Amino acid sequence: MAILGEDFFREQVRALWYESNRGCWWADKSKCTFCGIAEGGFRHKPMDRVLEDLRWLQGRFPDKYVFFTDLIINEGFAGKLLAALPDTEALPPLGMQLKVFRELHEVAELRAIQARVILPGIESFSTRLLKRMRKGTTGKQNLYFLRNAQSMGIQTQYALIWGFPGDTREEYDYLRWLIPKISHIRPPREFEAAQLLRDAPMYQEAGALGITNLAYWKVYDMVYPEWADKASLANYFVGDFPSEIYQAPELLQELEALVVQWRNHHRQSCLHMQSIGNGQYLIEDRRMVHGYEMRHHLVQEPRAQHIMTPTRMAACTEDHAWALEQALGVVLDDWYVPLVLAQSDLLLMLDQSATEVPIQQETAFDTMNS
C-alpha cells in the first residue's frame, strides 16, 4: 500500500489475498492425474485464527474481497466457520478454490459465509473421464453443483479438460447434446488439453498410465544453455499415449465451437422458475437447445418439486419424464439431474434433497477402487 499509494489501493485494488492452508487434502487421498502440485502434506490454520484474521481484514478493509490463496479450501470449511460465527455479516465477501460439494445444503453454507467467487474442480461431466483423472467426484455431482451455485448467486470459474491416457470418444461426445441444454449455466473459462507436469501422476506414473516417449517442451532449449540438464529443469512435458479424442479432430473442433457459442450466448440464455402464487410456478426457458426461443411452462407445486430434485431414474415419476421431454433435466449416471435455476429460498423449498437425509451417492473415490 505504501509503494503504490493509498489512493491507488483504495480505488484500484478490489481484493486482498489470504492463506489459511497449504497442500491439498484431496491429493493426500488420491492426487488428480494432471495435478502438478509439488508440495505434500495438507496443513491448515486453526479455525479461530482464520476467523480472527477475517474479522480484522473486514474491519480494516470493509470494501475489499478476500481471496484465499489456498490450493483447496479445507474440508468442511463453511460449516465450521458458520458454527464459529453465527453473524455472517461480519465476514468480507470471499473467493476460494474448492472441491465440488455433493449436497445443496453445503452450497447454501457457502452462500451464508459470503462466498461470492469460487473455483470448483469441475473438469468434466463424464464420470468415466473423471475417474481417469482421479477427481473424486461424478458428472451428476458436478452439474448439480453448478446449478446450485448459480441459483445461490455464487460466481463459478472452472475448466473442462480433455486428452487423457485411454480416454474414449464417448467420454466427450455427450457434450454435443448436453451443452445446448445447459447454455444458461455459467460456461467454463477454458476448454483445454491436459498438460503433463513434472509432479503430476501423469509424469510420475507415466509407465503405469501408458505414457511413453516423455520429452520436455522444446521451448526450454531457447531458455537454457546447451550444457544445462533441461530434462531435470523442465516442468512441462509431452508424451505419447492412446487417446481417442486426439484421433478425432472433427469432434474436438465441434466441441470447441459449441463452447465458444456457449460463452457468447450465455447471457441471453435462461432457465428459471419463480412462484406466481397459489402453489403455481412459472418456468421461463430460453436456451441454445431451443434456438434461444422463449418458452414458458406453468406447473403445480408437486410437479415443481419433482422437477427441481435429483432423483435416481428407478424412482422417477411421470413428472420427471415430462421434465426430460422439455429438457428441464438430464440423465447422468442413471440419475435425473435438474437444470432449472431458482432464487435460493425457493430452491431450498422445492429441492427435496435439501430437506431429506443427504443423498448417498457413490463417490468416484469409491468406484475407482471397486
Where are the predicted features?
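Radical SAM [4Fe-4S] cluster-binding motif and immediate context
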Residues: 1-152, 164
